[in-house]
């Protein structure tokens, strides 16, 4: 690869130094500053996901052929660098959210809000809006609870109940919240063609298929 081409590639995939500098100050930022930084991190992540989508590749797609050679249909170097940056920014975002929760709890304590730990977590989740998708819908069974909730194939999942990008634990927590809320509506936040959509999904066995949702969810 020519030096000029490499420099252009690096410019397209590197994290803005000013963003990196602000990330390093997460533990000293005020809550308002963290919310601005959260938006900027999410914007950068969306840009990276867009590049991967343009190449028709995800975070876990193979970059080599069955014979062990680099794929010729994707920019392997670019994808590798973007994946590395995405993982770094996801970790930074989790750190930011954890710090935000600490500051929110301190704020509520200072106001002498008397609530139990579960109620406080709910307040935290309402105060911080998660907009980064962490999974996508690869299949929806007709007539299923997911179908009735107007969930479509290729929709990206931002949150279901109180499960979001920062706490889904490899999608395991989705199963837990779904089982806990059988026959009770769950708020769902989706990303569809660049638009954030809200819907209500009621997990149920009262349909002709298997499972409580009738859809297949895969991690991004």
UniProtKB/Swiss-Prot annotation:
Q: Which SUPFAM superfamilies match?
A: PDZ domain-like
Q: Which InterPro entries match?
A: Nas2_N, PDZ, PDZ_sf, PSMD9
- State the GO CC annotations: cytoplasm; cytosol; nucleus
Limits of the PDZ domain: 119-196
Write out the entry's keywords from A to Z.
Chaperone
One Pfam family from the record: Nas2_N
Highest taxon of the lineage? Eukaryota
Gene3D superfamilies, sorted: 2.30.42.10, 6.10.140.1710
A GO term (biological process) for this protein? proteasome regulatory particle assembly
Q: What do we know about how this protein assembles, alone or with others?
A: Part of a transient complex containing NAS2, RPT4 and RPT5 formed during the assembly of the 26S proteasome.
What is the stated purpose of this protein? Acts as a chaperone during the assembly of the 26S proteasome, specifically of the base subcomplex of the 19S regulatory complex (RC). During the base subcomplex assembly is part of a NAS2:RPT4:RPT5 module; NAS2 is released during the further base assembly process.
As a miscellaneous remark, the entry gives:
Present with 846 molecules/cell in log phase SD medium.
Q: Its family? A: Belongs to the proteasome subunit p27 family.
Which PANTHER family would you find in this protein's record? Answer: 26S PROTEASOME NON-ATPASE REGULATORY SUBUNIT 9
Protein known as:
Probable 26S proteasome regulatory subunit p27
Q: Which organism is it from?
A: Saccharomyces cerevisiae (strain ATCC 204508 / S288c)
Lineage, top ranks: Eukaryota, Fungi, Dikarya, Ascomycota, Saccharomycotina
Q: Which gene encodes it?
A: NAS2
């Amino acid at each position: 690869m020519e030096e000029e081409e490499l420099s252009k590639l690096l410019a397209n995939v590197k994290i803005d130094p000013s963003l990196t500098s602000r990330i390093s100050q997460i533990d000293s930022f005020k809550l308002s500053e963290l919310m601005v930084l959260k938006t900027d991190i999410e914007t950068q992540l969306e840009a990276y996901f867009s590049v991967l989508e343009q190449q028709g590749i995800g975070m876990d797609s193979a970059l080599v052929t069955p014979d062990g050679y680099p794929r010729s249909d994707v920019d392997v170097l670019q994808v590798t660098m973007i994946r590395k940056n995405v993982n770094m920014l996801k970790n930074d975002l989790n750190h930011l959210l954890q710090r935000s929760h600490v500051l929110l709890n301190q704020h509520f304590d200072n106001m002498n809000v008397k609530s139990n730990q579960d109620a406080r977590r709910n307040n935290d989740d309402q105060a911080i809006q998660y907009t980064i998708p962490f999974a996508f819908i690869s299949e929806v069974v007709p007539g299923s609870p997911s179908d009735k909730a107007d969930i479509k194939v290729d929709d990206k999942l931002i949150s279901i109940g109180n499960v979001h990008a920062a706490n889904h634990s490899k999608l395991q927590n989705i199963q837990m919240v779904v089982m806990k809320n059988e026959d009770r509506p769950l708020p769902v936040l989706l990303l569809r063609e660049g638009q954030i959509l809200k819907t209500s999904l009621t997990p149920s066995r009262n349909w002709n298929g298997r499972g409580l949702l009738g859809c297949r969810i895969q991690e991004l």
